[in-house]
């Protein structure tokens, strides 16, 4: 979702927020519009200030964070089939994988599990990732 495209009004932005509330995406890729030389949009009039775009962006991110938190909290204590992708980049000794719903889950396990599907129980739902426990 691009926030603050030239000509976008606050009313149009609120329509975007309404759609996001209705759909409740698992995740969003969001950006503040920035002009790119050579594009038509770069030469368009842009009455929205950078500060306004930043406020809109924060509003969008806060909304998505609350949606993500609501969704992941419902996953606690459930077991999911997970594709084990790699060792965790941020947590040594942990593996990282994805549920069938594309949600990242980290759990303890041997690196030999990478590339396989495993059942993992969600022990701690966070906004953007899950912590879990490998099931036998």
Residue ranges and their predicted role:
Residues 1-39, 59-68:
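Conserved C-terminal portion of the radical SAM core fold
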Residues 43-136:
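Terminal RNA-binding accessory module
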């Amino acid at each position: 979702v691009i926030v603050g495209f030239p000509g976008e009004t606050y009313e149009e932005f609120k329509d975007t927020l309404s759609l996001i509330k209705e759909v409740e995406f698992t995740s969003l890729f969001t950006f503040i519009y920035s002009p790119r030389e050579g594009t038509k949009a770069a030469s368009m009039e842009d009455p929205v200030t950078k500060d306004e775009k930043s406020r809109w962006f924060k509003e969008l991110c806060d909304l998505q964070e609350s949606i993500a938190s609501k969704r992941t909290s419902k996953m606690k204590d459930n077991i999911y089939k997970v594709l084990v992708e790699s060792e965790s980049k941020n947590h040594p000794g942990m593996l990282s994988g994805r549920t069938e719903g594309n949600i990242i889950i980290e759990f303890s396990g041997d690196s030999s599990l990478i590339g396989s599907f495993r059942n993992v129980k969600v022990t701690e739902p966070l906004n953007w990732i899950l912590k879990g426990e490998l099931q036998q």
